[in-house]
Amino acid sequence: MNQLDLIKSSIKSIPDYPKAGIIFRDITSLLEVPEAFKATVDAIVAEFKDKGITKVVGTESRGFIFGAPVALALGVPFVLVRKPKKLPRAVISQSYALEYGEDTLEIHLDSVKENDNVLMVDDLLATGGTIDATAKLIRRLGGKVEHAAFVIWLPDLGGKERLEKEGINSFTLVEFAGH
């Protein structure tokens, strides 16, 4: 079995969770297979090791799981983007639209510097709303955002196209049809 097949086969699909009509892609099952988790991190690192990345940013919370080991392997700092009131130092905030309502993300003011070449990492690319808000935070701090990496891509939801319009190239490992 090749590495991408190992990764994909390690992700369990849960129908009708969290609501009817949704198929939830559960990365916790991937984390329970050390070879698949390592293959995931290794594939992202291989893609970005020669792109001059100076920071890796992970978005709460599953972006932390994959982003931190990627940053460690690349030898660069790892930066957290979190929900409001979770970061202790001075922050900036960015709101973004959800299917029904709005949410907000925050980043420490001193986490990204002018001209940092930032790789954003998250577990899943669906509509792209969360990672687009993350990119806006990074850019407001002067960072350069041209790359994002995801374990899972749901192509039917338009996230990759949304990010392309913002000048962000998406690297994805496996894709699943549907929601």
Curated annotation (Swiss-Prot):
Residues passing through the membrane, by range: none
Gene3D superfamilies: 3.40.50.2020
Catalytic activity: AMP + diphosphate = 5-phospho-alpha-D-ribose 1-diphosphate + adenine
Subcellular location: Cytoplasm
Listed GO CC annotations: cytosol
Pathway: Purine metabolism; AMP biosynthesis via salvage pathway; AMP from adenine: step 1/1
GO molecular function: adenine phosphoribosyltransferase activity
Pfam families linked to this entry: Pribosyltran (PF00156)
Keyword tags: Cytoplasm, Glycosyltransferase, Purine salvage, Transferase
EC annotation from Swiss-Prot or TrEMBL: 2.4.2.7
A biological process term (GO) from this entry: AMP salvage
Main localization, broad class: cytoplasm
Record-linked PANTHER family: ADENINE PHOSPHORIBOSYLTRANSFERASE, PHOSPHORIBOSYLTRANSFERASE DOMAIN-CONTAINING PROTEIN
Function: Catalyzes a salvage reaction resulting in the formation of AMP, that is energically less costly than de novo synthesis.
Assigned protein family: Belongs to the purine/pyrimidine phosphoribosyltransferase family.
Complex and partners: Homodimer.
Name of the featured protein: Adenine phosphoribosyltransferase
Species in which this protein is naturally found: Actinobacillus pleuropneumoniae serotype 5b (strain L20)
